[in-house]
Amino acid sequence: MKLKLIVGLSNPINLYYNTRHNIGSWYIKFLAKKYKKNLIKNKKYCFYYIDVKIGDYYSKLVIPDTYMNVNGTIIYNITNFYKIYSNEMLIVHDDLDLDTGIARFKFNHKNSTHNGIKSIYKSFGAKCIFNTLRIGIGRPKLNKNINSYLLNNPSPKEEILIKKTITKCIKCTDVLIKKNKDHAMNILHKK
């Protein structure tokens, strides 16, 4: 599968990098590190990026450096500038509805309650179709405030599990690009 753009949804990383809600930016940083690349800041358009060759294709790795609810504007501007279709992008984000340690690909994504995804639909239009990689962070126990939960760091135990999950996701992204989505899903979705 050809992915020209891989985006990790994020709040500003200098303020929120280690938080649960910035799991997408963790993923991009880990992926860039795998390819021995350092992200470059585009100050004018508020994002970090780097190009990497995965298999036969180059993919642009991006972390928007804005608040989650306006990530869509950054992504839209990037796709317009580089002539990338929405179905050629993979959006990586945290997911409250998946337990910590679980991740799922979703192809031809159509809706979500995640503010970063809502922002993409707002910028691209409701009929926009793209692919996602959802990384579970679980829900807070004892009906804790969701915003507080999202904007806090995971526990050390959760962080270890999240990092293991991201490592597995990166391997599966390689399979997705170099082979096919069914093979990648079989590996990622296996317990």
Swiss-Prot record:
Keyword tRNA-binding: yes
GO biological process, one term: rescue of stalled ribosome
Subcellular location per the Swiss-Prot or TrEMBL entry: Cytoplasm
Active-site residues annotated for this sequence: H21
Gene Ontology MF term list: peptidyl-tRNA hydrolase activity; tRNA binding
Top-level EC class: hydrolase
Reactions mediated catalytically: an N-acyl-L-alpha-aminoacyl-tRNA + H2O = an N-acyl-L-amino acid + a tRNA + H(+)
Pfam families: Pept_tRNA_hydro
UniProt site (Discriminates between blocked and unblocked aminoacyl-tRNA): N11
Top-rank taxon: Bacteria
Keywords carried by this UniProt record: Cytoplasm, Hydrolase, RNA-binding, tRNA-binding
Entry's EC annotation: 3.1.1.29
CDD domains attached to this UniProt entry: PTH
One GO cellular component, as annotated: cytoplasm
Binding site for tRNA: Y16, Y67, N69, N115
Residues of the site described as Stabilizes the basic form of H active site to accept a proton: D94
Family per record: Belongs to the PTH family.
Function description: Hydrolyzes ribosome-free peptidyl-tRNAs (with 1 or more amino acids incorporated), which drop off the ribosome during protein synthesis, or as a result of ribosome stalling.
NCBIfam families registered for this protein in UniProt: pth (TIGR00447)
Self-association and partners: Monomer.
Entry protein name: Peptidyl-tRNA hydrolase
Species of the source: Wigglesworthia glossinidia brevipalpis
Higher taxonomy: Bacteria, Pseudomonadati, Pseudomonadota, Gammaproteobacteria, Enterobacterales
